[in-house]
Structure formats: C-alpha cells, structure tokens
Curated annotation (Swiss-Prot):
PROSITE patterns: PUR_PYR_PR_TRANSFER (PS00103). Xanthine binds at D92, I135. This is Xanthine-guanine phosphoribosyltransferase. The lineage of its organism: Bacteria, Pseudomonadati, Pseudomonadota, Gammaproteobacteria, Enterobacterales. One of its GO terms (cellular component) is plasma membrane. Mg(2+) binds at D89. It catalyses: GMP + diphosphate = guanine + 5-phospho-alpha-D-ribose 1-diphosphate; XMP + diphosphate = xanthine + 5-phospho-alpha-D-ribose 1-diphosphate; IMP + diphosphate = hypoxanthine + 5-phospho-alpha-D-ribose 1-diphosphate. Homotetramer.
Amino acid sequence: MSEKYVVTWDMLQIHARTMAKLLLPAEQWKGIIAVSRGGLVPGALLARELGIRHVDTVCIASYDHDNQRDLNVLKRAEADGEGFIVVDDLVDTGVTAKAIREMYPKAHFVTIFAKPAGRPLVDDYIIDIPQNTWIEQPWDMGVVFVSPLAGK
C-alpha cells in the first residue's frame, strides 16, 4: 500500500455516531454481530449509541498487520442475520465481505470505511478510502511523546 490514512480515537467515535444515526430507529434491530477484530470497537460504539445489549461476534482471520492472507473462520454467530447489524471497520477487497454475506444473507452489513473494490458489498458505510491506502486504526497505534522542534 502506498498511502496511509491515520484514524484517531476521536475520529472513530464521530464516524460511529454518524453510522448509528443511519441505523435509527434502534428498535428494528435484534442485535449486533461484530467482525473480529476490526469490527469490535465500532460494534461496541454502535451498541452504546443504539442501546443494543445483544452483541455477538464472528471471528475471521484474514490479515497479519498489513498483509492479506487466506480467510479463516474461527467462530461464527449462529443466525442468518435477520434483524442484525453486522459491523466491520472496513471493507477492502471484498473477500471478507463476501464471506459475511454468505454467512448472514439477511443482515444489514455496515463498515466505517469502504474501498472501491468492496463498496458494493456493504449496505452502509461512512468514509470513502482509495484502494491503495492502508488504514492505521487507533487500536494499532500508541500515543508517544514527541519532542518539540525547537526543543532542548
């Protein structure tokens, strides 16, 4: 990936609240299925904003930091998705999204970020990201002290 897009905690919360507004009224949803690991934090934020207590996970391994590899479903929520929001942080190439669509054909699939190749596979997303851009999520970064430019 040639470009990077850095997401802060504040930005993520703002984007999740924007997504929650699109998902109102909350009463239409039975629960949330968060795609582990990228969808865990957005899923928690959506659960809070929508007052949803039923939160489950589908655990899929497809990345080692910035390298996509074969899809491996480690755990799935038992349902066809009807009445559920499935949330992930991002749709990229669409490989994971296609698997999600097959597992939960009746779910409402949302992501915070969407790249062109995967965009048609989600029902809602908030931010367009170019295909060649790597997203640095806040849970993958640490906050560190940076010396002033004119520091002593």
